[in-house]
Amino acid sequence: MTAGPSSDSKLNSSVNLVRSSHSWTEADSAAGFVLRYLSPMRRQLASVLGSTEEADEALKLLLGHLVQAGFGEHKRGRLRDFLVRGIRSCAKARMGELPEADRRELNLDGVTLGSREWISFWRECLLDRAWRALERHEHSHDDEPVFSVLNAATADSSATSDVLAARIREEFGVEIDSSQIEKILPLARALFAQLIADEVVETLESPSKADVKEEIKALGMAQAFSGLTV
Protein backbone atom coordinates (compact mmCIF):
# COMPACT_ATOMS: atom_id res chain seq x y z
CA MET A 1 0.00 0.00 0.00
CA THR A 2 1.31 3.42 -0.94
CA ALA A 3 0.52 6.35 1.29
CA GLY A 4 -0.63 9.81 0.39
CA PRO A 5 -3.54 11.91 1.62
CA SER A 6 -6.46 11.94 -0.81
CA SER A 7 -7.34 15.18 -2.54
CA ASP A 8 -10.44 15.72 -0.40
CA SER A 9 -8.68 15.20 2.93
CA LYS A 10 -8.81 18.17 5.24
CA LEU A 11 -5.38 18.46 6.78
CA ASN A 12 -6.40 20.81 9.55
CA SER A 13 -5.95 21.02 13.27
CA SER A 14 -9.53 21.48 14.42
CA VAL A 15 -11.76 19.17 16.44
CA ASN A 16 -15.53 19.41 16.80
CA LEU A 17 -16.15 18.35 20.38
CA VAL A 18 -19.86 17.78 19.85
CA ARG A 19 -19.79 16.28 16.34
CA SER A 20 -21.50 13.10 17.54
CA SER A 21 -25.16 13.48 18.51
CA HIS A 22 -25.54 9.96 19.91
CA SER A 23 -25.90 9.81 23.69
CA TRP A 24 -26.09 6.72 25.87
CA THR A 25 -29.39 7.96 27.28
CA GLU A 26 -30.94 7.60 23.81
CA ALA A 27 -29.76 4.04 23.14
CA ASP A 28 -32.43 1.66 21.84
CA SER A 29 -30.98 -1.20 23.88
CA ALA A 30 -29.38 -0.51 27.25
CA ALA A 31 -27.71 -3.91 27.43
CA GLY A 32 -26.54 -3.72 23.83
CA PHE A 33 -25.01 -0.30 24.34
CA VAL A 34 -23.27 -1.27 27.57
CA LEU A 35 -21.61 -4.25 25.84
CA ARG A 36 -19.18 -1.72 24.37
CA TYR A 37 -17.79 -1.15 27.83
CA LEU A 38 -17.48 -4.71 29.14
CA SER A 39 -13.69 -4.49 29.43
CA PRO A 40 -13.46 -1.81 32.16
CA MET A 41 -16.49 -3.26 33.96
CA ARG A 42 -14.96 -6.74 33.97
CA ARG A 43 -11.62 -5.41 35.21
CA GLN A 44 -13.27 -3.48 38.04
CA LEU A 45 -15.40 -6.44 39.07
CA ALA A 46 -12.41 -8.78 38.98
CA SER A 47 -10.59 -6.38 41.27
CA VAL A 48 -13.51 -6.41 43.71
CA LEU A 49 -14.54 -10.06 43.51
CA GLY A 50 -11.08 -11.57 43.21
CA SER A 51 -11.41 -13.41 39.88
CA THR A 52 -12.53 -12.95 36.30
CA GLU A 53 -14.87 -15.92 36.73
CA GLU A 54 -16.82 -14.18 39.48
CA ALA A 55 -16.65 -10.93 37.50
CA ASP A 56 -18.32 -12.66 34.56
CA GLU A 57 -21.08 -14.05 36.78
CA ALA A 58 -21.74 -10.59 38.19
CA LEU A 59 -21.80 -9.11 34.70
CA LYS A 60 -24.47 -11.61 33.70
CA LEU A 61 -26.64 -10.28 36.51
CA LEU A 62 -26.11 -6.67 35.48
CA LEU A 63 -26.75 -7.31 31.79
CA GLY A 64 -29.82 -9.38 32.62
CA HIS A 65 -31.21 -6.48 34.62
CA LEU A 66 -30.53 -4.06 31.76
CA VAL A 67 -32.28 -6.36 29.29
CA GLN A 68 -35.38 -6.38 31.49
CA ALA A 69 -35.45 -2.84 32.82
CA GLY A 70 -33.21 -0.77 30.57
CA PHE A 71 -31.48 2.24 32.10
CA GLY A 72 -34.64 3.13 34.02
CA GLU A 73 -34.91 6.26 36.11
CA HIS A 74 -31.12 6.52 36.40
CA LYS A 75 -30.78 7.40 32.71
CA ARG A 76 -29.01 10.70 33.21
CA GLY A 77 -25.58 12.22 33.67
CA ARG A 78 -22.42 10.27 32.86
CA LEU A 79 -22.51 6.66 31.74
CA ARG A 80 -19.39 5.84 33.74
CA ASP A 81 -21.19 6.95 36.90
CA PHE A 82 -24.23 4.83 36.05
CA LEU A 83 -22.01 1.82 35.44
CA VAL A 84 -19.97 2.16 38.62
CA ARG A 85 -23.23 2.11 40.58
CA GLY A 86 -24.23 -0.98 38.60
CA ILE A 87 -20.89 -2.60 39.37
CA ARG A 88 -21.37 -2.09 43.09
CA SER A 89 -24.90 -3.48 42.91
CA CYS A 90 -24.12 -6.58 40.87
CA ALA A 91 -21.04 -7.37 42.97
CA LYS A 92 -23.25 -7.45 46.07
CA ALA A 93 -25.88 -9.48 44.23
CA ARG A 94 -23.31 -12.03 43.10
CA MET A 95 -22.01 -12.47 46.65
CA GLY A 96 -25.59 -13.01 47.78
CA GLU A 97 -25.94 -15.91 45.34
CA LEU A 98 -23.00 -17.83 46.78
CA PRO A 99 -23.16 -20.21 49.73
CA GLU A 100 -22.28 -18.32 52.88
CA ALA A 101 -19.05 -20.27 53.28
CA ASP A 102 -17.87 -19.15 49.84
CA ARG A 103 -18.65 -15.48 50.26
CA ARG A 104 -15.86 -12.97 50.64
CA GLU A 105 -16.04 -9.64 52.35
CA LEU A 106 -16.50 -6.98 49.71
CA ASN A 107 -14.44 -3.83 49.89
CA LEU A 108 -16.32 -1.34 47.74
CA ASP A 109 -14.70 1.75 49.27
CA GLY A 110 -12.55 2.20 46.17
CA VAL A 111 -15.42 1.65 43.73
CA THR A 112 -16.73 5.19 43.62
CA LEU A 113 -17.57 7.78 40.99
CA GLY A 114 -14.15 9.38 41.38
CA SER A 115 -12.13 6.19 41.90
CA ARG A 116 -8.72 6.50 40.25
CA GLU A 117 -8.77 2.82 39.35
CA TRP A 118 -12.19 3.02 37.71
CA ILE A 119 -11.29 6.21 35.84
CA SER A 120 -8.11 4.53 34.61
CA PHE A 121 -10.04 1.49 33.36
CA TRP A 122 -12.60 3.77 31.71
CA ARG A 123 -9.98 5.95 30.04
CA GLU A 124 -8.17 2.94 28.61
CA CYS A 125 -11.43 1.63 27.18
CA LEU A 126 -12.29 4.90 25.42
CA LEU A 127 -8.76 5.24 24.05
CA ASP A 128 -8.84 1.66 22.78
CA ARG A 129 -12.14 2.31 21.03
CA ALA A 130 -10.68 5.45 19.42
CA TRP A 131 -7.62 3.52 18.24
CA ARG A 132 -9.82 0.83 16.69
CA ALA A 133 -11.90 3.49 14.95
CA LEU A 134 -8.71 5.06 13.60
CA GLU A 135 -7.60 1.67 12.31
CA ARG A 136 -10.96 1.16 10.58
CA HIS A 137 -10.55 4.57 8.94
CA GLU A 138 -7.19 3.48 7.55
CA HIS A 139 -8.66 0.25 6.20
CA SER A 140 -11.31 2.19 4.31
CA HIS A 141 -8.88 4.89 3.10
CA ASP A 142 -5.86 3.11 1.65
CA ASP A 143 -4.02 6.34 0.93
CA GLU A 144 -4.37 7.63 4.50
CA PRO A 145 -2.40 5.32 6.83
CA VAL A 146 -3.34 7.42 9.83
CA PHE A 147 -3.35 4.49 12.25
CA SER A 148 0.04 3.16 11.16
CA VAL A 149 1.66 6.59 11.30
CA LEU A 150 0.22 7.63 14.66
CA ASN A 151 0.84 4.20 16.18
CA ALA A 152 4.51 4.35 15.23
CA ALA A 153 4.89 7.98 16.30
CA THR A 154 3.25 7.28 19.66
CA ALA A 155 5.46 4.26 20.31
CA ASP A 156 8.58 6.41 19.82
CA SER A 157 7.90 10.13 20.06
CA SER A 158 11.57 10.99 19.54
CA ALA A 159 11.96 9.08 16.27
CA THR A 160 12.70 11.05 13.11
CA SER A 161 10.42 10.89 10.10
CA ASP A 162 12.95 8.67 8.31
CA VAL A 163 13.03 6.22 11.22
CA LEU A 164 9.23 6.20 11.41
CA ALA A 165 8.97 5.58 7.66
CA ALA A 166 11.26 2.55 7.91
CA ARG A 167 9.37 1.20 10.90
CA ILE A 168 5.98 1.64 9.23
CA ARG A 169 7.18 -0.10 6.08
CA GLU A 170 8.45 -3.02 8.16
CA GLU A 171 5.59 -3.37 10.66
CA PHE A 172 2.58 -2.38 8.57
CA GLY A 173 3.72 -2.95 4.99
CA VAL A 174 2.94 0.65 4.06
CA GLU A 175 5.18 2.28 1.47
CA ILE A 176 5.76 5.73 2.86
CA ASP A 177 8.53 8.32 3.01
CA SER A 178 9.41 11.03 5.51
CA SER A 179 7.66 13.81 3.59
CA GLN A 180 4.41 11.84 3.53
CA ILE A 181 4.68 11.19 7.25
CA GLU A 182 5.02 14.92 7.92
CA LYS A 183 1.79 15.48 5.98
CA ILE A 184 -0.18 12.58 7.43
CA LEU A 185 0.84 12.87 11.09
CA PRO A 186 -1.09 16.14 11.74
CA LEU A 187 -4.17 14.58 10.11
CA ALA A 188 -3.77 11.44 12.21
CA ARG A 189 -3.47 13.40 15.44
CA ALA A 190 -6.49 15.56 14.66
CA LEU A 191 -8.58 12.56 13.60
CA PHE A 192 -7.61 10.58 16.70
CA ALA A 193 -8.57 13.50 18.94
CA GLN A 194 -11.87 13.79 17.08
CA LEU A 195 -12.57 10.10 17.62
CA ILE A 196 -11.82 10.46 21.33
CA ALA A 197 -14.25 13.38 21.53
CA ASP A 198 -16.90 11.31 19.74
CA GLU A 199 -16.42 8.50 22.25
CA VAL A 200 -16.71 10.89 25.19
CA VAL A 201 -19.87 12.52 23.83
CA GLU A 202 -21.66 9.18 23.65
CA THR A 203 -21.05 8.62 27.37
CA LEU A 204 -22.59 11.95 28.44
CA GLU A 205 -26.17 13.18 28.54
CA SER A 206 -26.83 15.91 25.94
CA PRO A 207 -23.40 17.44 26.56
CA SER A 208 -22.29 20.95 25.69
CA LYS A 209 -18.81 21.71 24.40
CA ALA A 210 -17.83 22.69 27.94
CA ASP A 211 -19.13 19.37 29.30
CA VAL A 212 -17.00 17.41 26.83
CA LYS A 213 -13.93 19.49 27.65
CA GLU A 214 -14.47 18.89 31.34
CA GLU A 215 -14.84 15.13 30.89
CA ILE A 216 -11.75 14.90 28.68
CA LYS A 217 -9.78 16.71 31.37
CA ALA A 218 -11.25 14.56 34.16
CA LEU A 219 -10.23 11.41 32.30
CA GLY A 220 -6.68 12.64 31.76
CA MET A 221 -6.90 12.74 27.96
CA ALA A 222 -6.30 16.46 27.36
CA GLN A 223 -2.82 15.78 25.96
CA ALA A 224 -4.38 14.24 22.84
CA PHE A 225 -5.86 17.67 22.03
CA SER A 226 -2.65 19.64 22.54
CA GLY A 227 -2.06 22.06 19.68
CA LEU A 228 -5.52 21.51 18.22
CA THR A 229 -8.36 23.99 17.93
CA VAL A 230 -11.42 22.76 19.82
Task: Please annotate each region the language model reported.
Residues M1-V230:
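Intrinsic, short, N-terminal disordered tails of RNA polymerase sigma-factor systems
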